[in-house]
Amino acid sequence: MDKIQKDINEALETGRRFNILKMFSVAPLFSFMIILGTYYPINLFRMASEAGRDPAVPLTSMVTQLTSVENSLIPPNSFFGFLFLFCWFCYICFYVISKRNRIKTYLLTQVLQLILFIIFYYSWFVAILYLIPLVAIRIVYWIGFVLSLIYLVYILVTKQSASKDYFSSEYYKKFLNVILFLWLLMYGINLFTNGLNHFLAYLLLALLPISPIFLGLFLVSFFKSNVVTLENLNAVNKNQEKYREEYGYTIEEWYGKKSKMYKEHVKKSKKR
């Protein structure tokens, strides 16, 4: 089974699973989980930062204050409420579209998935900045974040597929020294500012500030692997009959019983 047929099978199976019950039960729950995963990290660390250092609350001793510029880049709470409604509205639209075009439905879900993943990436990126006390390092991370987004645009424009694995041994050695240096730097800062108390805890906490590097690499790899799927689905969506006949799908399997194409096919069959 080639990649195109695999994407077609996933698209048709996803289209078959769309129903009215899921639109009012699973879709809101899924949207809520997305909001929880994007809203909670930022606000947890922001509240701890605004509370100041309180010995009774361990988290307050781990976070730092962001600059006014960084705070202005944090989306307001209303954004996450809008995102919840937007996701729910999108899935309702996908349900309607799935009744006549399953391929397009799956294509749109993949696009929405990428958008949500970028928002998730940004949310966790900002949250982790609260664990980085040095402004200079945060500036470097901000530059890296912007460059990663520019690279994503480059991937879309050039239609670059996942031809390179950033976690292979070739790239592993290049990033290992950088990651090790940053980890030791963060660990040294924690020891200098907090002393030798909770030695193991600060050893593990030193890993958190370098996690944006792993987030960025994972995002790029995930994005590149999905570019091929988006290209395949877009090509199939533009020439559905060609691919349906080429891969041997029936009209019912491809469009569904409630589709206009299937109903017209049944009418023509009865006239014969």
Which residue ranges define each predicted feature?
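C-terminal transmembrane-bundle signature of multipass membrane proteins
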Residues: V178-R272
